[in-house]
């Protein structure tokens, strides 16, 4: 089979595919070129950079394309239903990056609690702000509210409990056996917002507006910390910035943004924002696992 890799892939996994007799082409296509290019491939492997929309699927009709694989979890960059309606299957790799994303969320929690981002920045400016940043808080004993309790949320919950946090979770699809095994109770959204000292979002993008809206921020504790490593659209960035300015929100840790590359300079430049450029799954280990899942998916075709 001919396999297109648009946004990079683990080299070992690509070598395996070639050893199995497949032709692997590593090439990024601009949106106006993508649809026509897809006609010549049986499989397309994409990451978040490549968007496969209706017009690309229409342009690929009559060609070879049978499968689109999203290397990662979220498939909101692919018009999944339209692809399937046109005979093109869509798969993702949900297991591979869960630990990496959860660890980054935990890292942002520590950064927000102890001023790690701004303290490091000011030191590089030659400043010694010991008093200014000597008002950190511990995570032990605090309540973490996880919004979206899938694989990533579960990994984060286990780590948070290990350092002595109380963990509660909200998910529209509740799996009682998971809650019981991890000893992490489900609660309603409003209860989570009212109880949590830290709110970490791990839900897919939702229709109908941001999960972390001005209305929901108002329901949170004063001094709450908000973490988002899911999708940028899950947080109303203007509402978050206003809450940071007012002190309602103590700090925020962000890996994803409404626009990417991020364009809300006031938000990501705020001294109480710990920010990273959408690198949740960008670890050596996660990329190897993603590559192996892709190899397995193609082998099963």
Question: What is each of the regions a protein language model found here?
Answer:
Residues 12, 162-180:
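NAD(P)-binding Rossmann-fold cofactor-contacting core
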Residues 60-66, 86-88, 165, 222-224, ...:
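A short helix->loop->beta-strand "cap" motif at the edges of active sites that frequently abuts
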Residues 84, 91-104, 129, 256-301:
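C-terminal helix-to-coil terminal segments
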Residues 86-88, 93-143, 158:
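Phosphate-binding beta-alpha-beta segment of Rossmann-like dinucleotide-binding domains, i.e.
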Residues 149-150:
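Glycine-rich Rossmann-fold phosphate-binding loop(s) that bind the pyrophosphate
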Residues 153-154:
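N-terminal Rossmann-fold NAD(P) dinucleotide-binding loop
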């Amino acid at each position: 089979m001919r396999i297109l890799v648009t946004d990079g892939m683990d080299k070992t996994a690509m070598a395996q595919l070639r050893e199995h007799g497949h032709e692997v082409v590593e090439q990024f296509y601009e949106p106006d070129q993508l649809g026509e290019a897809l006609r010549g491939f049986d499989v397309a492997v994409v990451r978040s950079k490549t968007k496969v929309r209706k017009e690309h699927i229409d342009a690929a009709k009559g060609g070879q394309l049978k499968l689109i694989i999203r290397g990662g979890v979220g498939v909101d960059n692919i018009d999944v239903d339209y692809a399937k309606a046109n005979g093109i299957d869509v798969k993702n790799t949900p297991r591979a990056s869960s630990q990496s994303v959860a660890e980054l969320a935990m890292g942002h929690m520590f950064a927000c609690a102890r001023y790690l981002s701004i303290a490091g920045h000011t030191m590089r400016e030659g400043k010694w702000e010991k008093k200014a940043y000597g008002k950190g808080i511990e995570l032990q004993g605090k309540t973490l509210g996880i919004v979206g309790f899938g694989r990533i949320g579960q990994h984060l919950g286990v780590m948070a409990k290990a350092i002595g946090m109380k963990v509660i979770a909200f998910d529209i699809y509740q799996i009682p056996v998971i809650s019981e095994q991890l000893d992490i109770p489900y609660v309603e959204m409003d209860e989570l917002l009212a109880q949590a000292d830290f709110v970490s979002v791990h839900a897919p993008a939702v229709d109908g507006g941001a999960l972390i809206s001005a209305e929901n921020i108002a329901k949170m504790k004063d001094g709450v910390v908000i973490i988002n490593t899911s999708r940028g659209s899950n947080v109303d960035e203007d509402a978050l910035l206003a809450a940071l300015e007012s002190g309602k929100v103590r700090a925020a840790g962000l890996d994803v943004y409404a626009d990417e590359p991020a364009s809300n300079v006031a938000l990501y430049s705020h001294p109480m924002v710990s920010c990273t450029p959408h690198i949740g799954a960008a670890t050596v280990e996660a990329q190897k696992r993603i590559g192996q899942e892709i190899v397995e998916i193609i082998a099963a075709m």
